[in-house]
Design a protein with these regions (language model features):
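A short beta-strand motif characteristic of beta-propeller blades
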Residues: 1-3, 36-50, 86-98, 133-145, ...
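Eukaryotic tandem repeat interaction scaffolds
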Residues: 77-79, 83-160
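Blade-level signature of beta-propeller repeat domains, shared across WD40, Kelch, NHL, RCC1
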Residues: 193-226
């Protein structure tokens, strides 16, 4: 158990490291086995300098890139630059996406290689990580309007799932149009109240839900989401 300089919002594990984003404008990086602190992306000072981010909300790794969604941009850092005791430089930042607090989520469609990212402005932004080049601010390759405010998303065998506010709180969504295909707010005997962050691993949906008495995490077999 550790304390951060701001409220933690996103976490991921990849290649024996744990990455935690928080509103203190940093992404903390730990050794996954010893939990020893290694370094951080962002120096804790709000800004857009070469070693800065603004409030960090989510983090994802894909093909050697660490991707961090902060309050304004998606920041890209080379994974090979992550070294203990060294603050890595931002490789490149996306175009300005609008300065908004909220819950953000990112996932890569392995079939197309596109990065999908939620935004509180009722939209899902698309990027092409394979085309990232140093010194060139990547622009969105697409944008999907969404019925509700999306919080998080993930793919499972080509199917896109999105958590959000509104009546349809957890849905399967068409990855090309953003249209809701099926509402899974009720899964078996579980009715989600206020789901937010989730991931799908080992054929299982792990999803946080804010319920009356606090927050719980469900583990639901994907076979239940037909």
């Amino acid at each position: 158990t550790g304390k951060f300089g701001g409220r933690p919002n996103g976490v991921t594990r990849a290649n024996d490291k744990i990455y935690v984003t928080h509103e203190g404008s940093r992404t903390e990086i730990f050794d996954a086995k010893s939990h020893q602190f290694l370094t951080c992306i962002g120096n804790g000072s709000w800004g857009t300098g070469p070693t800065q981010t603004v409030h960090a909300f989510d983090v994802l790794l894909y093909k050697g890139l660490v991707m961090i969604h902060d309050k304004r941009y998606v920041n890209f850092v080379e994974e090979q630059a992550i070294q203990s005791g060294v603050t890595p430089r931002i490789y490149v930042r996306s175009e300005h996406l609008g300065e908004t607090n909220g819950t953000y989520g990112m996932a890569v469609d392995e079939q197309t290689g596109l990065l999908y990212s939620t935004h509180p402005a009722k939209r899902i932004d698309l990027f092409a990580p394979d085309g990232i080049r140093e010194g060139v601010s990547p622009k969105r390759t697409g944008q999907l309007a969404y019925k509700n405010v999306p919080y998080d998303l993930d793919f499972y065998e080509g199917r896109l799932f999105v958590s959000s506010d509104g009546t349809e709180k957890f849905c399967e969504v068409n990855p090309r149009t953003g249209e809701i295909m099926k509402d899974h707010t009720t899964i078996g005997g579980i009715t989600l109240q206020a789901p937010e962050k989730f991931c799908i691993r080992r054929h299982t949906l792990f999803i946080t839900d804010r319920v009356k008495n606090g927050t719980c995490v469900y583990a639901i077999p994907m076979s239940e989401l037909k």
